[in-house]
UniProtKB/Swiss-Prot annotation:
Organism from which the protein derives: Methanosarcina acetivorans (strain ATCC 35395 / DSM 2834 / JCM 12185 / C2A)
Keywords on record: Heme, Hydrogen peroxide, Iron, Metal-binding, Oxidoreductase, Peroxidase
Name assigned to this protein: Catalase-peroxidase
Residue segments, region Disordered: 1-30, 351-373
SUPFAM superfamilies: Heme-dependent peroxidases
EC number: 1.11.1.21
PTM comment, free text: Formation of the three residue Trp-Tyr-Met cross-link is important for the catalase, but not the peroxidase activity of the enzyme.
Reaction it catalyzes: H2O2 + AH2 = A + 2 H2O; 2 H2O2 = O2 + 2 H2O
Subunit structure as annotated in this protein's UniProt entry: Homodimer or homotetramer.
Amino acid sequence: MGGNVMTDDKMNSVTSGANKQETGRDMSNRDWWPNHLKLEILHQHSSKSNPMGEDFNYAKEFKSLDLAAVKKDLAALMTDSQDWWPADFGHYGPLFIRMAWHSAGTYRAGDGRGGGGRGQQRFAPLNSWPDNVNLDKARRLLWPIKQKYGRKISWADLMILTGNVAMETMGFKTFGFGGGREDVWEPDQDVYWGSEDTWLGDERYTGDRDLENPLAAVQMGLIYVNPEGPNGNPDPIAAAKDIREVFARMAMNDEETVALIAGGHAFGKTHGAGPASHVGPEPEAASIEAQGLGWKSSFGTGKGDDTITGGLEVTWTNTPTKWSNNFFRILFGYEWELTKSPAGAYQWKPKGGAGAGTIPDAHDPSKRHAPSMMTTDLSLRFDPVYEKISRHFYENPGQLADSFARAWFKLTHRDMGPRARYLGPEVPAEELIWQDPIPAVNHELIDEKDIAFLKDRILASGLSISQLVSTAWVSASTFRGSDKRGGANGARIRLAPQKDWEVNQPAELAKVLNTLEGIQSEFNSAASGGKKVSLADLIVLAGCAGVEQAAKNAGYDVTVPFLPGRMDALQEQTDVVSFALLEPIADGFRNYLKAQYPLPAEELLVDKAQLLTLTAPEMTVLVGGMRVLNTNFGHTQHGVFTQKPEALTNDFFVNLLDMGTEWKAVSDVKDIFEGCDRKTGEVKWTGTRVDLIFGSNSQLRALAEVYGSADAQEKFVQDFVAAWTKVMNLDRFDLA
């Protein structure tokens, strides 16, 4: 036994782990197998990490909040300067604007991820990004107010609200505020911030400065652009290209971009009092006694006039705590020459010493300075498109104020989804096209008798189960849980651009919609008492009818839950450019790939499942069901592992797990595979990477085994119906 006896230390996993931390780090499955499928993103933000309990209703709590009292407390905080982190110019407003901006500004329109909707600035990596230096202090300054109001206001809402109050206390009229951002309690795992492994790395570019999708920042750890210019090159014209690219990826046009930069830089200053070598580790790397505060500086006092944040030392205007048009007055009022901050960062000053003594010091009333600008500020003057807009704003300050108010509201609410999700007394009445408006219900809804009648009409229409299910799926599955856009409500599948997307098979879609519109017209004409059915409802109902019939074909009578209340959006309520970003490049649920991508198809499936807020079991049962319902793009038979298509059986799993089948790639690309009889070599099935991953990946195989078991058919049908219903209702915020 002597050679096998374990010492106490070896047996004690805690002690062993502690020793391990001193010599190295524990190896995760992903360290061993870098291509390991990242299924954990389907299970983030579960109840196990949430301290609030299953009965907690944030919307209800927020509605009970005295918002005016919160704003009064925030207004008092703005000028309550603390010795441990004194306010520039005696006002914390500019710091809080930066906090709110950097909370919301991580949003990118490409996949809807990022943004301020979940309070992620509290967690890694955002809490430790180089662009967020010293925002930890802003949140600590807010803690007494958060502590006072507790569960009634989330950190996510409080950070955005504080940015609004900051502006209002400095004389700016904001456009409004909508609450409803519910906090999460762990870092997001689904957001791809880039492949770089060093701060400020920029391996995200290829070719002629082509930025990788869906990224919306030029370097790892920045919110947008490098203020010194591309890679620190102080070229305002080149910087303008970066600005235009990343702001567009945040869904901002040129006018909104100029308004945001100029409006934001009406306030406050940047901080570059000394070399960055004086700055200590970021919050996530700081010592335990720092209690989550980072970037402790050894330069002078480390605060006040000695603060080092981004390295630039720029104060844009002579009125840094008062709303004005002085940013443009100063930008156009001087000729500029390149200089460096005390930290060594490139910035600009007026030529010939002009403007000396016109800018106040942030902490010493006896000191005065010259104006200064960043390279990216000068982009607004020297890029010809930006210059025209900037000149217009300079000459029309009222237009700047309105454009900035609207752009700021869009910046801080873009990831919240439809206006129906906004809470509180300051929600603006105006409906904005980027909110993807849908008309309010203006008619009596169909009842159970009507639903049964319409199902019968649909099933007798000549449309196949595959057509009914596919159409409902492509309508509903545009939903993104990230920014709450897309979904079946609005029936935008019949409008540009969605009606022409390849994934929707436009010719077949038009046939299905024409048939359903005929049924809709017939019903609405015959109905009395103002009762109507919207096409949005009818599309979903048709899919539900198809699923019910498929279950019946498999020997099971089920009723798929259906709740009417969707409405049909108009083309003029649909921003074509914005909606184009929702076009799927892949839909593994229908075995669709628009092109070959660097990421394998199975990763794209998981990504879409995450955007649909699906769990791994829900993803699994939906793929298995969609295959046997014959819903593949182009009617391919890849993954249709059944002899009874359009019957809701568990055949996909039974046949995938059949050890009598051997799988072989048909080409070196390894995207299509043939399943051959091990004995005869006869080809039985064909499948894609998405199909085979449910037998290859150990976690997904475990789930497939559940649904492929002899006693699993009824469970499979029930679970498919539940997951299907979830997808159909993802955008039904009116039901919450």
